[in-house]
Amino acid sequence: MKERILILLLLATVCSMQAQNIHMALRPDDLLIDNFEGDTFGNWILEGNAFGNSPVSMERLSIWGDNRFEGNRMASSFVNGDAGTGVLKSPLFRIERRYVNFLIGGGVDYQREYVALWIDGKEVKRSTGYNRRVMEYESWDVAEYMGKNARIVLVDQSKEGWGFINADCFYQSDTKLEKEIFAKRMLVTHRYLNIPVKMGAVIEQMDIWIGDKMVRNMEVELGGDEPDYWVTLEVKDWIGQELRIEASKSPNVEQALNQCFCSETPKEENLFYKEPLRPKVHFTSRRGWLNDPNGLVWHEGEWHLFYQHNPYGCIWGNMTWGHAVSRDLAHWTELGDVLHPDSLGPIFSGSVVVDKKNTLGCQQNGDTVLVAVYTSAGGFGYHTRHLQHSQSIGYSLDKGRNWVTFSGNPVLPTLVRYNRDPKVTWHTPTGRWIMVLYLDKQEYAIFSSPNLMDWTETDRFKLEGADECPDFFEMSVTNEPTVRKWVFTGANSTYLVGSFDGYRFRTETKPVKMDSGTNYYAVQTYSNAPDDRRIQIAWMNGSNFPDMPFNQQMSFPRELTLHRVDKGYVLKSMPVNELALLYGRKYIWKSLVVEEKNCFTTKLNTPAFYLKTGFAVDSVDAQLSLIHI
């Protein structure tokens, strides 16, 4: 998953959000420490460039997309973006109440970006954000330090994505600052729970409970007005049980949650795939945001496309695995979400393999098992912000329709903070599973396992010019049929070719970027594909669909072939031949003569077409073919 890239997309997407000014309503006996409403930081001590020279104004906050703060200003280390570093120290004050209350937001990193409380020069409390720009309540119990000298310290020593901390309205009180919760109870009567979404509304944390068990949690733009669109959560497994839906209490939240209802089909189902900006050929999700393709696998006649999905909004977040299948790589059927955020974090990118030898030991009745290996993204999500990234597995016994998460997760603990995106393949000569994993700063690691549960590191290397979303596969060389080579790719399609003995990858080429555009990212290829085909799909990360109930799209499937050339080996990428299945009526114009005042025009009643042209530049003769899709 994409801390570096997605923060840019997030900023671009949320800038239209409605800012919500929180009135903290201090009690008469509360003691204000600072709410940063002045033009300067006053007697606070500044170090570095992260916090600028003054509190950040409401106008700048609105541009950034911050949508919950107190008053007109706050302290933020995002003044110079993620790259800024620095420290902001308050003047000394005396502890005179039981609690120090404040608002906090920004990145989650207890080591490098946080708010701390010092007592007599020694740190005694520390809090961090949770990778959200929305400010949340925080409260420190300081009763044991009554009467002692204290100092608040804001620290930002991170230059990575989400490398900033926001804070506002520090005050002392004998009352703990806590969110007031509104709860809606409802009986599950049908297959889907319908949830209203208001674009640009404040993003609220929404938790769904059955009894004392939280079964789902998500961040949703909940507004009190008429919703812009509806999203759904499949609740068929809970029919007959009572749900308790909780979110921060406000008139808008109450109005939105009271609109939630159950139905046998999704609300607005009649509008699916009919929106004016909906791509006609590229895969898009019915509702919500998508990014990385995940778990690309062919199994029993179906091409499975799992993908990073926000089922509850058109901005990045709530990372869940969506699922679609195709029998021909041209027509896709969306099946719904399969892996949801859990106690280890949101579900970031990964891969799916066919466990033909039942190495995981989950096979039943002879049915082949599909196993997903993915990143549990601790550090993201309100309830898992205190965790770090780890690698987990899940399995399916019914062709990917339903999944069970492994009870022993994670199967690979944290190595570095944002290690992620495991790609797994079977290595026949050693009879073991191989995992490639992104670590940090263009560095990757290779692991092996006999059973998908127990992993041993065997190699580390760097891919200059790329990071995250690794892929690793063996291919025949087209013009040297007896030769097979291993190919390693990074997210932006930069690749290396070399040899692999099951333990170490030895490169034989320099890094080459296969796709030079800016709309082809998080590249992944299919495992277990028939006829030894190597089919690749990418996230088209340069697209955007304003005011639509969906966002982002996938590339066409491409077929890769490996070729020997004078300088070594190169990959060739072409759209799969199956796209011809989309073609309809064909229009051909030949021997066209193009003149400055004689432009060729025609009317075609078609929403999409494939254009093929040929030009003879010297004679300005042209041929034009249009094929209806």
What are these regions (language model features)?
Residues 21-53, 176, 276, 573, ...:
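Extracellular carbohydrate-recognition regions
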Residues 24-28, 125-128, 133, 176-178, ...:
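Surface loop/turn signatures of beta-propeller and other carbohydrate-active proteins
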Residues 40-74:
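Extracellular glycan-recognition surfaces and repeat-rich motifs
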Residues 72-99, 136-138, 177-187:
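Short beta-strands within extracellular/lumenal beta-sheet-rich domains
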Residues 101-103, 152-154, 195-196, 245-246, ...:
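Hydrophobic core segments of beta-strands in well-ordered, beta-rich domains
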Residues 117-165, 178, 196, 210-239:
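Extracellular carbohydrate recognition and processing domains
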Residues 179-196, 201-212, 237, 243-249, ...:
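Beta-rich accessory regions
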Residues 374, 627-629:
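Conserved small/polar residues in nucleotide/adenosyl-binding loops
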